[in-house]
Curated annotation (Swiss-Prot):
This protein's encoding gene: rplE
Classification via PANTHER family: 60S RIBOSOMAL PROTEIN L11-RELATED (PTHR11994)
Protein name (database record): Large ribosomal subunit protein uL5
Organism expressing this protein natively: Lachnoclostridium phytofermentans (strain ATCC 700394 / DSM 18823 / ISDg) (Clostridium phytofermentans)
A Pfam family per the record: Ribosomal_L5
GO cellular component term of the entry, any: ribosome
């Protein structure tokens, strides 16, 4: 069992139950999945850019990335329907907790001028979205092998009903929210 999952079972569940007064332990919010999405705009012209992004994503997430395709044609972006424009990974279970642990304790502290993540990026349904500006903050990525700095979206999907519950859950996991 991963470190973060053990902390959840032993400490977080009890803390959440005490704070919100849940009657049943199945009511206690938990992390459902983490979705990592990387939009690669230049992929429509350059297939190598997408390959590099997929490779980086697989190194960071530890599992195979799915290539995302454009759903609609947009003339202003010179984009046609069905063209590959990015990649994503959905993490669940052990890999999800392992990634969350690495993100919170290793990657985020390596961000330049880091003062915490935005505490207002909840969607109203207990999910949290976080933008990462460069993939170099992850220790698995070798600086010399990076062709271009790319950002990504990391979405924490929880079973929490409200943003307040989700914020408390992520705070107990150690997410460094700015004041």
């Amino acid at each position: 069992m991963t470190r973060l999952k053990e902390i959840y079972k032993n400490e977080i569940m009890a803390g959440m139950q005490k704070k919100f007064g849940y009657k049943n332990e199945m009511q206690i919010p938990k992390l459902d999945k983490i979705v990592i999405n990387m939009g690669v705009g230049e992929a429509k012209d350059n297939a190598k850019a997408l390959e590099a992004a997929v490779k980086d994503m697989e190194i960071i997430a530890g599992q195979k990335a799915v290539i995302t395709k454009a759903r609609k044609s947009v003339a202003n972006f010179k984009l046609r329907e069905g063209v590959a424009i990015g990649c994503k990974v959905t993490l669940r279970g052990e890999k999800m907790y392992e990634f969350a642990d690495r993100l919170i304790n290793l990657a985020l502290p390596r961000v330049r001028d880091f003062r915490g993540v935005n505490p207002n990026a909840f969607d109203g349904r207990g999910n949290y979205a976080l933008g990462v500006k460069e993939q170099l903050i992850f220790p698995e990525i070798e600086y010399d092998k990076v062709d271009k700095v790319r950002g990504m979206d990391v979405i924490f999907v929880t079973t929490a009903k409200t943003d307040e519950e989700a914020r408390e859950l992520l705070t107990l996991f150690g997410m460094p929210f700015s004041k």
